[in-house]
Design a protein with these regions (language model features):
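C-terminal non-catalytic regions of proteins with extracellular/luminal or membrane-system context
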Residues: 1-18, 55, 156, 285, ...
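N-terminal beta-rich core of secreted/periplasmic extracellular enzymes
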Residues: 2-216, 248-263, 281-351, 367-388, ...
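Binuclear metal-dependent hydrolase catalytic cores centered on His/Asp/Glu-rich metal-binding motifs
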Residues: 224-246
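Histidine/acidic-residue-rich catalytic or RNA/ligand-binding cores of hydrolases
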Residues: 116-117, 226-227, 272-278, 282, ...
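Short glycine/proline- and charge-enriched loop/turn segments
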Residues: 126-128, 177-180, 227-235, 319-323, ...
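Glycine-rich phosphate/diphosphate-binding loop of Rossmann-like nucleotide-binding domains
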Residues: 220
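Extended catalytic-interface subdomain
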Residues: 265-272
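Conserved, charged catalytic cores of large soluble enzymes
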Residues: 377, 384-409
Length: 604
């Protein structure tokens, strides 16, 4: 390796903290500050390094002029071209400034939900149920295997940091982010996050690992009225049930398992007392009591604290406003918000790309270089732990692994084995809520009416027919939500009422009067199924499944072993009367947490 930062070389046998400090000491102040930023970028093929991005400056400016070395990947090219594009950016980073390589991160990419601020629909990698579906299966070995699959796919693509797992508890039924959690039970989530981190990072963080960013500390989920804190109307996080500590349980497990990084949530705690002290009502990342006092000192976390994205600067993205999520400090200027974040104990600013803000604070004497060095050292240490400074290509991927990845199916980085595992897990996660005797499994020869399922998914023996010719119907519906589209990302968030529109209910009831109906509901949130549960012949929940996986579960080709990872409320009135911070506390739920019609409500 060449460059003022990395030469003369420091022996890999030297203590990793000493190596990190030595490298930081060799860097200019501007290069150190560049490490403290983690913006999102869009990457095409071929990569256009000189074109301005919809999110800000060109890639060349970010890498060369601003010295940024951590990037979250938003839109990317087809997987066959990702590696080449990222290698081009690595070469640019290696030729300038600190010569440190880039750490590319990503939101989840292995499931169904496409939300540019939270997750990406699987494309070229194996497709699994949403994490809530893994929570429904409840198999630690499978979750560990899933982590290993994600690790292999990311490494093959050149991605070395995951902005997941999300281990918030699904305690407010209306909240939009439940599908990416493991469910409402604290201990269950803790077991699964341990297994996931073992798969993603390995026993110890090292050259074979993907660095995990566990989120959203100290637990999203207790949102007032279930509204999402990406938006001003959802900024308040409340604890009327006094269950703050429940939400820490999975984070304690993640810290014990060695998570590389932790991301605080956007939410602003309201009326929260902790150990006899009133917690300041500002967004979690701005809160020194919770980041330094709780996370660093009480819980002993010494990894990277990466803020959630967009806490400092207002933005307009694709023509939609996206105000900074600076809840409780909206009155502060961007530079004052940056100072608050570093005072709180944050190491890196997610979604921000302007190091001049920190450089100005240094010039003013409002942040000293020792504070910058502490965070920069953590970020260099992470690169060292991942082996990025010990590989000639700077991303820690062995050639053999890259060659193996090229052997996947056409258009896929994943192996056929991984693809099959993901599809099978989609079926396994499905949860039978009710079934009349003799309905399931569906037989091999049927005249069936399919609604919102592709006819191509039907088995060879089925005749897909119009309703008047059918002996049974299989219907898919998604969980209800209220469409909104004022702010960027708002249209991607399923929020509001969990009750189905009467036209949906009436349509299913009318069909059920003519023939038995097997109703499959995608439970991205805990839908109110009370008007339908006694009407249909079988009621089944899925947590992210393709049509073929749905049919495989309904025909018994794969056994649907899922149990509800959250309860299904009986009514919206019951939801409104519940406490947002308390797991599974709606009055007289239609189905309790852990329920399956094939085994009651006791999780095995």
């Amino acid at each position: 390796m060449t460059g003022t930062t990395l030469s003369p070389a420091i022996s890999s046998s030297t203590d990793i903290d000493v190596r990190a400090r030595t490298i930081v000491e060799r860097m200019t102040v501007a290069e150190r500050v560049g490490l403290l930023f983690h913006p999102m970028i869009f990457v095409g093929s071929p990569v256009e390094v000189d074109q301005p991005s919809p999110l800000g400056p060109s890639l060349r400016e970010l890498i060369v002029e601003r010295g940024i070395r951590y990037f979250c990947l938003g839109a990317i090219p087809p997987v066959a071209h990702v590696r080449e594009a990222l290698d081009d950016l690595q070469a640019l980073a290696r030729s300038t400034g600190s010569r440190l390589p880039i750490v590319f991160s990503t939101d989840p990419r292995h499931s169904f939900v496409q939300n540019d601020g939270a997750s990406h629909r699987a494309d070229g990698v194996s497709q699994w149920p949403e994490p809530i579906g893994l929570g429904a299966i409840g198999d630690e070995d499978l979750v560990r295997r899933f982590g290993e699959v994600v690790r292999a796919d990311y490494r093959a693509l050149g991605i070395r940091m995951a902005l997941h797992p999300q281990i918030d508890l699904a305690t407010e039924p209306r909240w939009a982010r439940q599908a990416q959690s493991f469910g409402a039970d604290p201990e269950h989530s803790a077991r699964l996050v341990r297994a996931y981190l073992e798969g993603l990072q390995g026993a110890h963080l090292g050259p074979e690992s993907i660095a995990a960013t566990t989120k959203h500390f100290p637990g999203g989920g207790p949102q007032k009225d279930g509204e999402d804190p990406h938006f001003v109307y959802g900024r308040e996080q409340v604890y009327p049930g006094g269950r703050f500590e429940d939400h820490l349980v999975p984070f304690r497990a993640a810290i014990e398992a060695g998570t590389a990084a932790i991301m605080p949530y956007y939410g602003m705690p309201v009326g929260l007392d902790l150990h006899g002290e009133r917690i300041e009502e500002v967004g979690f990342a701005f809160n020194r009591q919770l980041i330094t006092g709780l996370l660093r000192e009480r819980l002993g976390f010494d990894g990277v604290v990466l803020s959630d994205f967009g806490l400092v600067t207002d933005a307009t993205v694709f023509g939609k406003p996206f105000p900074a999520r600076a809840w409780g400090v909206e009155h502060l200027s961007p530079i004052e918000r940056v100072r608050r974040l570093f005072d709180a104990g944050v190491d890196q600013l997610g979604g921000e790309n302007d190091p001049a803000l920190v450089l100005e604070l240094i010039d003013r004497g409002e942040i000293d270089t020792a504070r910058v060095d502490a965070s920069a050292t953590r970020l260099v240490r992470l690169q060292l732990q991942l082996g990025l400074l010990d590989e000639p290509d700077g991303d820690g991927r062995a050639k053999a692994e890259g060659d193996a990845a090229a052997g996947g199916a056409d258009g896929f980085v994943a192996s056929p084995e991984h693809i099959a595992l993901g599809i099978r897990a989609q079926s396994q996660a499905m949860t039978v809520l009710t079934e009349r005797e003799g309905i399931l499994p569906l037989g091999p020869e049927l005249r069936v009416h399919l609604r919102d399922l592709a006819p191509a998914a039907a088995p060879a023996g089925w005749q897909v027919v119009a309703p008047e010719d059918a002996e049974i119907a299989v219907v898919r519906v998604g969980a209800p939500f209220e469409p909104r589209d004022t702010y960027f990302l708002e249209s991607s968030m399923e929020q509001g009422s969990l009750a189905f529109d009467t036209t949906v209910v009436d349509g299913i009831r009318a069909l059920a009067e003519r023939m038995p109906v097997v109703l499959v509901v995608t439970l991205s949130r805990p839908a109110i199924l009370t008007p339908l549960a006694d009407t249909v012949a079988a009621l089944v929940g899925d947590f992210g499944a393709g049509d073929a996986a749905v049919i495989a579960a309904l025909t018994g080709e794969v056994e649907p072993v899922g149990r509800l990872p959250f309860e299904l409320p009986r009514s919206m009135d019951a939801v409104r009367r519940s406490s947002p911070d308390v797991p599974s506390d709606t009055e007289d739920p239609l189905f309790p947490i852990g329920w399956s019609a094939r085994g009651g409500s006791v999780r095995s």
